[in-house]
Amino acid sequence: MIQQETLLQVADNSGIKKVMCIKVLGGSKKRYASVGDEIIVAVKDAQPAFGLKDSTGKKVHNKAVQRAVVVRTTKEIRRPDGSYIRFDDNACAIIDDKGNPKGTRIFGPVARELRDKKYAKIISLAPEVL
């Protein structure tokens, strides 16, 4: 479960390494985000010479605000067949306003639940889907 102030790893090659969740999207009462949910993040650690630009055309730097989708959580997720899956870290992928990933590669496994949430592009970039 991801909530405000949670630190996450970035699982793509967008040049951003660590982010902090500042808002969970999906209604005013939504407190926690799970796999497949969109969040607003603040960049905490980015490669300064990387060419990623935000929507206004400026280079991304620390404190920049981005949209992201959660791809891994340490809190287990219950599947419809009764099984559970959990990961070793909390990770997200940076997306644009249309929901497309900004990076061209995804590092590490991602959960199958992303397919149900209409993130097929992230699924296709991932090396392993669990």
Curated annotation (Swiss-Prot):
Query: Per UniProt, which keywords does this protein have?
Result: Ribonucleoprotein, Ribosomal protein, RNA-binding, rRNA-binding
Which one of the record's GO molecular function terms can you name?
Answer: large ribosomal subunit rRNA binding
> What GO cellular component entries does it have?
cytosolic large ribosomal subunit
Q: Which NCBIfam families match?
A: rplN_bact
* Subunit composition and interactions: Part of the 50S ribosomal subunit. Forms a cluster with proteins L3 and L19. In the 70S ribosome, L14 and L19 interact and together make contacts with the 16S rRNA in bridges B5 and B8.
What does the record give as the function of this protein? Binds to 23S rRNA. Forms part of two intersubunit bridges in the 70S ribosome.
Q: What is this protein called?
A: Large ribosomal subunit protein uL14
This chain's source organism reads Leptospira interrogans serogroup Icterohaemorrhagiae serovar Lai (strain 56601)
Q: Which gene encodes it?
A: rplN
